[in-house]
């Protein structure tokens, strides 16, 4: 299946299949009761989501939205869990997938624990370039989303981006 920028793959709270992201980039947002959205995760190529449902079914934690054009395989839940039961060696493959995700989260922790806001932003921009080049971070995320992801205010992100543009 092909998803274009801005299209939704699944909605928070629903249940359904798992998905393998072949190419592209997805964001996972949590929608609160007041309607506000918080960016909680980014999904990169070769991830199978939702992560919390790889071993047993669970409703979707957030809403998945394409940041750029994505190619996605639909993995029917019943088939996925039956194959796990029939082939216990697949649990090792799932453990390796989760290990990769944990390593990515460690990189994210490194980004958000940088001392200066400018360095936090620089590290996030460098990480994103591996997935979206030649596009830029601001081509796929709003300043609010960048701020949410880095634990900074939108105003700080705006100031840092203007400073970067002025120094080029």
Predicted regions and their residues:
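Regulatory nucleotide-sensing modules
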Residues: 1-23
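Short beta-strand segments in beta-sandwich/barrel cores
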Residues: 8, 25-30, 48, 71-72
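Short beta-strand His + acidic residue motifs that chelate non-heme Fe in jelly-roll/DSBH
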Residues: 28-29, 51, 62-66, 149
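Ligand-binding loop in jelly-roll beta-barrel domains
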Residues: 55-78
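Short aromatic/basic micro-patch
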Residues: 42, 74, 140
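Phosphate-/nucleic-acid-contacting segments
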Residues: 120, 124-168
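A small-molecule sensor/coupling module
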Residues: 79-116
């Amino acid at each position: 299946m092909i998803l274009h920028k801005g299209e939704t793959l699944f909605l928070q709270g629903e249940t359904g299949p798992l998905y393998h992201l072949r190419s592209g980039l997805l964001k996972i947002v949590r929608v609160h009761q007041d309607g506000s959205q918080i960016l909680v995760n980014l999904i990169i190529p070769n991830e199978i989501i939702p992560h919390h449902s790889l071993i047993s079914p669970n409703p979707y934690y957030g809403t998945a939205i394409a940041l750029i054009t994505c190619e996605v395989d639909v993995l029917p839940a019943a088939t996925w869990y039956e194959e796990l039961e029939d082939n216990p060696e697949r649990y090792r493959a799932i453990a390796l997938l989760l290990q990769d995700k944990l390593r990515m989260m460690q990189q994210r922790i490194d980004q958000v624990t940088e001392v200066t806001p400018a360095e936090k932003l620089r590290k996030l921009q460098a990480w994103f370039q591996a997935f979206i080049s030649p596009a830029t971070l601001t081509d796929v995320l709003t300043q609010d989303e960048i701020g949410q992801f880095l634990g900074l205010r939108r105003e700080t992100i705006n100031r840092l981006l203007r400073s970067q543009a002025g120094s080029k």
